[in-house]
Protein backbone atom coordinates (compact mmCIF):
# COMPACT_ATOMS: atom_id res chain seq x y z
CA UNK A 1 0.00 0.00 0.00
CA UNK A 2 2.89 2.34 0.76
CA UNK A 3 4.36 1.58 -2.64
CA UNK A 4 1.10 2.55 -4.32
CA UNK A 5 1.01 5.84 -2.42
CA UNK A 6 4.56 6.60 -3.60
CA UNK A 7 3.92 5.63 -7.22
CA UNK A 8 0.74 7.68 -7.60
CA UNK A 9 2.35 11.13 -7.05
CA UNK A 10 5.24 10.12 -9.32
CA UNK A 11 2.85 9.31 -12.15
CA UNK A 12 1.03 12.62 -11.64
CA UNK A 13 4.24 14.70 -11.67
CA UNK A 14 5.94 12.85 -14.53
CA UNK A 15 4.05 14.63 -17.39
CA UNK A 16 4.94 18.03 -15.94
CA UNK A 17 8.65 17.22 -15.69
CA UNK A 18 9.07 15.52 -19.08
CA UNK A 19 7.35 17.50 -21.87
CA UNK A 20 7.54 14.66 -24.40
CA UNK A 21 5.75 12.33 -21.98
CA UNK A 22 2.74 14.63 -21.77
CA UNK A 23 2.02 14.18 -25.46
CA UNK A 24 2.76 17.73 -26.60
CA UNK A 25 2.96 17.83 -30.37
CA UNK A 26 5.84 19.44 -32.21
CA UNK A 27 5.09 22.39 -34.47
CA UNK A 28 6.78 25.13 -36.52
CA UNK A 29 9.29 22.87 -38.27
CA UNK A 30 9.75 20.78 -35.10
CA UNK A 31 11.17 23.68 -33.11
CA UNK A 32 8.08 24.46 -31.03
CA UNK A 33 5.47 22.71 -28.89
CA UNK A 34 1.67 22.86 -28.99
CA UNK A 35 0.44 24.09 -25.59
CA UNK A 36 -2.59 25.80 -24.10
CA UNK A 37 -0.40 28.64 -22.80
CA UNK A 38 3.18 29.47 -23.65
CA UNK A 39 5.78 29.48 -20.90
CA UNK A 40 8.01 32.43 -19.98
CA UNK A 41 10.58 33.07 -22.71
CA UNK A 42 8.40 31.57 -25.44
CA UNK A 43 6.49 33.27 -28.23
CA UNK A 44 3.34 32.21 -30.09
CA UNK A 45 4.11 31.61 -33.78
CA UNK A 46 1.13 29.62 -35.04
CA UNK A 47 -1.96 27.76 -33.91
CA UNK A 48 -2.12 24.00 -33.53
CA UNK A 49 -5.11 21.67 -33.51
CA UNK A 50 -7.63 21.88 -30.64
CA UNK A 51 -7.08 25.66 -30.26
CA UNK A 52 -3.58 25.29 -28.85
CA UNK A 53 -0.73 27.72 -29.46
CA UNK A 54 2.55 26.79 -31.12
CA UNK A 55 5.12 28.05 -28.61
CA UNK A 56 8.75 28.46 -29.64
CA UNK A 57 11.65 29.93 -27.67
CA UNK A 58 11.68 33.68 -28.33
CA UNK A 59 15.44 34.13 -27.86
CA UNK A 60 16.26 32.22 -31.08
CA UNK A 61 15.67 33.16 -34.70
CA UNK A 62 13.30 30.49 -36.01
CA UNK A 63 12.35 30.04 -39.63
CA UNK A 64 9.98 27.62 -41.31
CA UNK A 65 12.79 26.14 -43.41
CA UNK A 66 16.16 25.70 -41.75
CA UNK A 67 19.02 27.48 -43.45
CA UNK A 68 21.28 25.11 -45.33
CA UNK A 69 24.45 25.74 -47.22
CA UNK A 70 24.33 25.09 -50.96
CA UNK A 71 25.79 21.78 -52.00
CA UNK A 72 28.27 22.03 -54.87
CA UNK A 73 27.45 19.81 -57.82
CA UNK A 74 31.09 18.95 -58.41
CA UNK A 75 34.43 20.17 -57.21
CA UNK A 76 35.83 23.10 -59.15
CA UNK A 77 39.16 21.53 -60.10
CA UNK A 78 39.46 21.12 -63.87
CA UNK A 79 39.77 17.59 -65.11
CA UNK A 80 39.89 15.61 -68.32
CA UNK A 81 36.17 16.00 -68.90
CA UNK A 82 36.49 19.80 -68.78
CA UNK A 83 39.17 19.61 -71.46
CA UNK A 84 36.99 17.45 -73.66
CA UNK A 85 34.02 19.75 -73.31
CA UNK A 86 35.98 22.88 -74.25
CA UNK A 87 37.40 21.52 -77.55
CA UNK A 88 36.37 23.76 -80.43
CA UNK A 89 35.82 22.39 -83.91
CA UNK A 90 37.61 24.12 -86.80
CA UNK A 91 35.40 22.71 -89.56
CA UNK A 92 32.20 24.69 -89.79
CA UNK A 93 30.71 23.07 -92.92
CA UNK A 94 31.28 19.94 -94.91
CA UNK A 95 29.31 18.13 -97.56
CA UNK A 96 28.90 14.40 -97.98
CA UNK A 97 28.14 13.11 -101.43
CA UNK A 98 27.95 9.65 -102.88
CA UNK A 99 28.95 8.32 -106.26
CA UNK A 100 25.28 8.01 -107.22
CA UNK A 101 24.71 11.72 -106.58
CA UNK A 102 27.69 12.59 -108.78
CA UNK A 103 26.39 10.42 -111.64
CA UNK A 104 22.95 12.02 -111.46
CA UNK A 105 24.47 15.50 -111.54
CA UNK A 106 26.61 14.67 -114.55
CA UNK A 107 23.63 13.22 -116.43
CA UNK A 108 21.56 16.28 -115.67
CA UNK A 109 24.33 18.50 -117.01
CA UNK A 110 24.57 16.53 -120.26
CA UNK A 111 20.87 16.84 -120.94
CA UNK A 112 21.36 20.27 -122.47
CA UNK A 113 24.24 19.07 -124.66
CA UNK A 114 22.19 16.57 -126.67
CA UNK A 115 22.05 17.31 -130.36
CA UNK A 116 18.83 17.79 -132.26
CA UNK A 117 17.88 15.09 -134.79
CA UNK A 118 18.59 15.87 -138.43
CA UNK A 119 15.44 16.69 -140.32
CA UNK A 120 15.49 16.20 -144.14
CA UNK A 121 13.21 18.29 -146.29
CA UNK A 122 12.16 17.03 -149.67
CA UNK A 123 11.57 19.39 -152.53
UniProtKB/Swiss-Prot annotation:
Query: What family, per the record?
Result: Belongs to the beta-defensin family.
Q: Which UniProt keywords apply?
A: Antibiotic, Antimicrobial, Cleavage on pair of basic residues, Defensin, Disulfide bond, Secreted, Signal
The major lineage groups are: Eukaryota, Metazoa, Chordata, Craniata, Vertebrata
What PANTHER family does this protein map onto? BETA-DEFENSIN 123-RELATED, DEFENSIN BETA 118
Cystine bridges: 27-54, 34-48, 38-55
User: Where does the secretion signal sit in this chain?
Assistant: 1-19
Q: Its function?
A: Host defense peptide that exhibits antimicrobial activity against both Gram-negative bacteria, such as E.coli and S.typhimurium, and Gram-positive bacteria, such as S.aureus and B.subtilis. Inhibits cell adhesion of E.coli on intestinal epithelial enterocytes. Causes rapid permeabilization of both the outer and inner membrane of E.coli, leading to morphological alterations on the bacterial surface. Binds to bacterial lipopolysaccharides (LPS) with high affinity, and may thereby be involved in immunoregulation through LPS neutralization.
The superkingdom of the source organism is Eukaryota
Q: Please name the Pfam families in this protein's record.
A: Defensin_beta_2
* GO cellular component, as recorded: extracellular region
Q: What compartments host this protein?
A: Secreted
Name it: Defensin beta 118
Question: Polar residues bias located where?
Answer: 112-123
**Which stretches of sequence are listed as region Disordered?**
100-123
**An annotated Gene Ontology molecular function:** lipopolysaccharide binding
Could you say which tissues express the protein in this record?
A: High-level and epididymis-specific expression. Most abundant in the epithelium of the caput and present in the epididymis lumen and bound to sperm. Also expressed in pancreas.
Q: How is it modified after translation?
A: The three-dimensional structure formed by the three intramolecular disulfide bridges is indispensable for antimicrobial activity.
Matches recorded under InterPro entries: Beta-defensin (IPR050544), Beta_defensin_dom (IPR025933)
GO terms for biological process, alphabetical: antimicrobial humoral immune response mediated by antimicrobial peptide; cell-matrix adhesion; defense response to bacterium; defense response to Gram-negative bacterium; defense response to Gram-positive bacterium; innate immune response; killing of cells of another organism; negative regulation of cell adhesion
Q: Where is the composition biased (Basic and acidic residues)?
A: 100-110
Please give the residues making up the propeptide in this record: 65-123
Amino acid sequence: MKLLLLALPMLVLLPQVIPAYSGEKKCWNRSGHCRKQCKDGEAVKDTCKNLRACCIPSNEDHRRVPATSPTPLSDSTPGIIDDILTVRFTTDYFEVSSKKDMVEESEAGRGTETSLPNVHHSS
